[in-house]
Amino acid sequence: MKISTKGRYGLTIMIELAKKHGEGPTSLKSIAQTNNLSEHYLEQLVSPLRNAGLVKSIRGAYGGYVLGSEPDAITAGDIIRVLEGPISPVEVLEDEEPAKRELWIRIRDAVKEVLDSTTLEDLASYTDGEQEAYMFYI
């Protein structure tokens, strides 16, 4: 399974909404500008996310999108499944050697476990350890 730009950009939309959760609606235009992405492409991606209940649209001059649930209730797996379909890195064939079949199943389950245990809250609050500021004492 290779995650396409649909999945990558969909995660970007959702992470940006999670970062601004509780602050009101966020426009796709601002997400597109912040991440240097095509607003038109993001509009195509937000429709299935809205239909799945992962985001809600707010109309009006100050409208935009908000998360459909709390950031800790939405997983990366939820988003990827909506945009990419079932999570299956390799098609498991019944007539394949048992050892290889077991390997493919273990790989599939490991990928699912990572995606299903990573919440939007985790992704939105992630900080790279190297970005920590130095503390100078006098």
Curated annotation (Swiss-Prot):
Alphabetized InterPro entries for the sequence: TR_Rrf2-type_CS, Tscrpt_reg_Rrf2, WH-like_DNA-bd_sf, WH_DNA-bd_sf
Gene Ontology MF, one: core promoter sequence-specific DNA binding
NCBIfam families: Cys_reg_CymR (NF047409), rrf2_super (TIGR00738)
Subunit structure: Homodimer. Forms homotetramers at higher concentrations of protein. Forms CymR(2):CysK(2) or CymR(4):CysK(4) complexes in the absence of O-acetylserine.
Domain HTH rrf2-type: 2-125
Listed PANTHER family: HTH-TYPE TRANSCRIPTIONAL REGULATOR ISCR, WINGED HELIX-TURN-HELIX TRANSCRIPTIONAL REGULATOR, RRF2 FAMILY
Outcome of gene disruption: Grows slowly with cystine as sole sulfur source.
DNA-binding region range list: 28-51
Disulfide bond entries: none
GO cellular component, one term: cytosol
A Gene Ontology biological process term: protein heterooligomerization
Keywords: DNA-binding, Repressor, Transcription, Transcription regulation
Protein name per UniProt: HTH-type transcriptional regulator CymR
Protein task: Master repressor of cysteine metabolism in B.subtilis. Controls the expression of genes involved either in cysteine synthesis from sulfide (cysK), sulfonates (ssu), or methionine (mccAB) or in cystine uptake (tcyP). Activity of CymR is positively regulated by CysK in response to cysteine availability. When cysteine is present, the pool of O-acetylserine (OAS) is low, which leads to the formation of a CymR-CysK complex and transcriptional repression of the CymR regulon occurs.
